[in-house]
Amino acid sequence: MIDTLLDPMIWLILVTLGHTGPGVILPTNWADDTAKMVAGWMLLTSVTLLYLAFGMDGEEQGRLALVIAGPVWVWFLVCISQGLEYTMGKEPITMTWKANAPPLVLWGVLALSGLLSSGWV
């Protein structure tokens, strides 16, 4: 049961959905060219995650999931702890613990599932 819950493929798909929909598509101001360019660049992460979910398996999948998700999780921690602000839509958004709990949990569990299936522990 725990192996199924911590299967990197499941978390790769969940992170891709969370990253693509509420993370990029919904908050983007599509009238702004810079925002469109940044959103397009960020959507490339979704392609990478989907390839990793469906094109790899086993320890290789776990290791690459860890290598991708681990730094993203650390990046969220640093941005939140510094209270950084960004503008992706019409209003500036400040990185707070409350607002960023869902992506922090998703990327963190993806990194954990990758670590546990990597064969490194």
Segments predicted by a language model, with ranges:
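Structural signal for membrane-spanning alpha-helices in multi-pass inner-membrane proteins
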Residues: 23-26, 49-53, 79-86, 110-117
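Core segments of alpha-helical transmembrane spans in multipass integral membrane proteins
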Residues: 14-22, 33-54, 70-74
